[in-house]
């Protein structure tokens, strides 16, 4: 949304491996984009962040297996555990990540996308006449536009949430055994593998990253396997939203689908997280 500065949009490049992502990021920074876009930070490529990871004898990761709102499908849970196992086998530490509520973060971030009652989204669709997918059709019925005071209050809340999460992250220095807070977080990218058409109904595993302005790199891990990733027929849902997501899981349909996880770092840690992603990818696919 033009003029919405609470949670800014970014371009997320895609590549077949982390080394290619590093190359394209370096190439972009060499063009000094801060001379062309006033919102770009004037920060050239920082090789020290990259070398810090490559020279570390031991890293520590936090693992978020579920956000407590919507639990991941079996293939996604298995992928997270594969990453945990690979890191521990390589001598690194993995601790449980028990952060402040992601629900509050997600709800606050979502509110920033509807400041204008959906006018920007509807005008974009009107240019082509393309119908809205069911997942975003709610933009057609929004009526309330946020006032300046309401937007300011949300901005204050986002700042509070960032500080709260930062303080939790800092506190992990007492749990890691490395003398540093957790280096990165391992968590699902979405509760499902590669999404089925019109089934991408929950965005919470990426919304919190965007709202806090953190750095995330997605790493491919495995493929769904119907012989392993069985549906839990006795599953007890958290609520109706979680139930709908779990009901959508079908081992036969998802069989062979790509499954990824995301590795999350703090603000402005692109070089560091690309190095982490390259290392983790190497462990998984050695």
Where are the language model's segments positioned?
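Short, well-ordered beta-strand elements within core beta-sheets of diverse protein domains
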Residues: 9-16, 142-144, 262-265
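Short hydrophobic alpha-helical runs that function as membrane-insertion/retention elements
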Residues: 216-220
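Amidase signature
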Residues: 27-211, 221-253, 268-272, 279-286
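A short core secondary-structure module
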Residues: 1-45
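Glycine-rich phosphate/pyrophosphate-binding loop shared by adenosine-nucleotide-utilizing enzymes
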Residues: 259
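Buried hydrophobic packing segments
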Residues: 21-24, 140, 263
């Amino acid at each position: 949304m033009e003029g919405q500065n609470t949670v800014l949009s970014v371009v997320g490049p895609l590549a077949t491996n982390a080394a290619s992502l590093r190359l394209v990021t370096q190439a972009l920074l060499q063009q000094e984009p801060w001379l062309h876009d006033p919102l770009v930070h004037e920060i050239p490529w920082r090789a020290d962040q990259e070398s810090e990871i490559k020279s570390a004898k031991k890293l520590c990761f936090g693992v978020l297996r579920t956000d407590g709102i919507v639990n991941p499908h079996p293939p996604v849970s298995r992928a997270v555990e594969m990453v945990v196992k690979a890191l521990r086998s390589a001598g690194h530490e993995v601790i449980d990540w028990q952060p402040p509520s992601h629900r509050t973060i997600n709800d606050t971030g979502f509110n920033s996308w509807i400041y204008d009652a959906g006018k920007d989204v509807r005008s974009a669709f009107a240019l082509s006449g393309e119908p809205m997918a069911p997942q975003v059709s709610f933009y057609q019925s929004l009526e309330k536009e946020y006032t300046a005071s309401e937007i300011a209050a949300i901005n204050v809340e986002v700042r509070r949430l960032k500080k709260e999460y930062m303080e939790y992250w800092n506190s992990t220095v007492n749990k890691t055994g490395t003398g540093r807070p957790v280096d990165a977080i391992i968590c699902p990218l979405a509760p499902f593998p590669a999404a089925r058409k019109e089934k991408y109904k929950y965005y919470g595993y990426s919304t919190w990253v965007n709202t806090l302005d953190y750095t995330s790199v997605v790493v491919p891990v495995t493929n769904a396997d119907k012989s392993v990733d069985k549906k839990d027929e006795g599953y007890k849902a958290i609520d109706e939203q979680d139930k709908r997501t779990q009901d959508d899981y079908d081992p036969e349909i998802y069989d062979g689908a790509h499954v990824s996880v995301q590795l999350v770092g703090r603000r402005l840690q692109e070089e560091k997280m690309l190095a982490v992603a390259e290392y983790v990818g190497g462990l998984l696919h050695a």
